[in-house]
Amino acid sequence: MLFDRYVKNSIKGGTRDKRKEKKSTGIRRNVDNRDQRIGNWERFIILEDNKASLAHFLSTKISESYSAPPGRELVINGGFKETLKMWSSDTSRQDVRELASDHEEADTRIVLHARDTAARGYKQVNILCRDTDVLVLLLAHREHLCQEIWMFAGTSRQRRYIPVHRIPLSEEKRKSLLAFHAITGCDMTSQFYGVGKVLAWKVFEDAPDLFEHLGEESQISADVLAKAEAFVCKLYNPGTQEVEINKERAAAFRKSKKDLDAQPPTQDALILHIKWANYQTMVWNKALEPCPSLPKPEDS
């Protein structure tokens, strides 16, 4: 059982704040007993403090009462108030502390635990999750995971089983996959208006090298920035040789002045977007590290 952590002044926190602007006001509730009535669930779950309280309650109560069947192990991570606290039902494990992590997202923590499964000799790992970001993370890091990686998505009525290990992906594309996903839109970054993943993937297939080195360093170099800008130019005009987004924007505006939202972004706006995507890619690249060294978002 893996939970998100709720860190203030983070990229994830900023994303949650934007989502809250479109919703009703939350109601603060501290969850401290199993008979407690939550009331309006939507107004409860909108507040980070409520979600953190619920995660801590579940983590504490389950760890106190759970009795694992023979041959099974339950690990709980991310839900306790203490950042590095985690719990395993297998009291004989000597290496369990290696899973103590300070990841903000459960997405990356899933990959960390999946790698632990492979390190312990298991050949197959099953992951219950409906998040596209997790699927992309598993693909990007699958060389460090089990031989078989199954992701259980869908709903209880319509289940979907994704064999991650069978998805064809060249090594060049695998190395740039996280950067591609961050640039074209994920939970943390916005999507370019009118540019879906299918179109973006077609452009990516022809030029995966344009994301080389994105997410490797917190301070993005001029060369990496220029390659990412050239990729975005191709998103709006796949056949273009233009590498400057302002020129591509001007050309698109001359062709059609009706839908301004569908025009390419300005270079200033795009640079901020690329820097944001670079930081998120760096976080994902470090998913296998329990306590990765990351700069503050405002310093990147």
Indicate where each model-derived feature is located.
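Noncatalytic, typically N-terminal accessory segments of nucleic acid-processing enzymes
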Residues: M1-S300
